[in-house]
Amino acid sequence: MEWTDDGIVLGVRRHGESSAIVELLTRTHGRHLGLVRGGAGSRMRPLLQPGNSVSALWRARLDEHLGTYALEGTRMRAASLLASSHATYGVTHLAALARLLPERDPHEVIFAMLERTLDDFDRAGGAAIHLIRFELAMLSELGFGLDLSACAATGATGDLIYVSPKSGGAVSRQAGEPWRDRLLPLPPFLRVTHDEQDGWSEQDLLDGFELTGRFLLRHVLEPRGQGHSDARAGFINAVVRKRTAAIADGARVMAELNPPST
């Protein structure tokens, strides 16, 4: 048995003296493990870092065997990801999310989304929006998707600003007004009418993580006896710190450009 596929490194663990078991999310073969001979050595270490993209050749005598990987790097992102705190936490959390997928089942939509997310992870705010959308996609892929396309109460498709914490359906401003204290905010960047040129606030990001986090806990993590990864909280805190620092820097620059008159 053998196949070739594109993959993204999710994790690696030492096996024996010199080998390693590498976990990939592959484009057409899903989350898949394999043995890399010499994978524990210093020569292979830069390649086998979470977030890197590889071309993978997998071989095994039988399909159900662990098999071996021969890997070649196609996009080496790890160095840039490790250069910033939000990206370091983010790639760890993304790998933890991908591990929720059944092994060896194809999830091409999730693979493509993970690839796009990792390719645009430099800016903390943009990375946060990507990660929230990835969590939303994971809910859908695991069978617990939220319907944010129309109001759950009226069927209207405009002015959707809330989400029902029970059904996971969007709710319009008018229909949700009497119960707004019980509803979850729907961040602008998750609305069907969102324009990518529109801005966002720190609170929008926190609302997004609250929304996806609540449903991930209820439907996916708690039934497995799990909670959110520590990396998720670390990512959110790193993004907030960078946002706060950027605002402070902007205020300082404005003060320098417009000194008080004497």
Swiss-Prot record:
Per UniProt, the keywords (alphabetical) are: DNA damage, DNA recombination, DNA repair
Please, one GO biological process term?
double-strand break repair
Instruction: Write down the PANTHER family for this protein, in alphabetical order.
Output: DNA REPAIR PROTEIN RECO (PTHR33991:SF1)
The reply to whether DNA damage figures as a keyword in the UniProt entry is: yes
User: What job does the chain carry out?
Assistant: Involved in DNA repair and RecF pathway recombination.
Coiled-coil zones: none
Q: Name one GO cellular component term.
A: bacterial nucleoid
Identify its protein family: Belongs to the RecO family.
The organism encoding this protein is Nitrobacter winogradskyi (strain ATCC 25391 / DSM 10237 / CIP 104748 / NCIMB 11846 / Nb-255)
Please identify the protein, giving its name as recorded.
DNA repair protein RecO
Q: Which cysteines are joined by disulfide bonds?
A: none
Does DNA repair count among this protein's keywords? yes
Q: Which Pfam families match?
A: RecO_C (PF02565), RecO_N (PF11967)
Q: Which Gene3D superfamilies match?
A: Nucleic acid-binding proteins, Recombination protein O, C-terminal domain
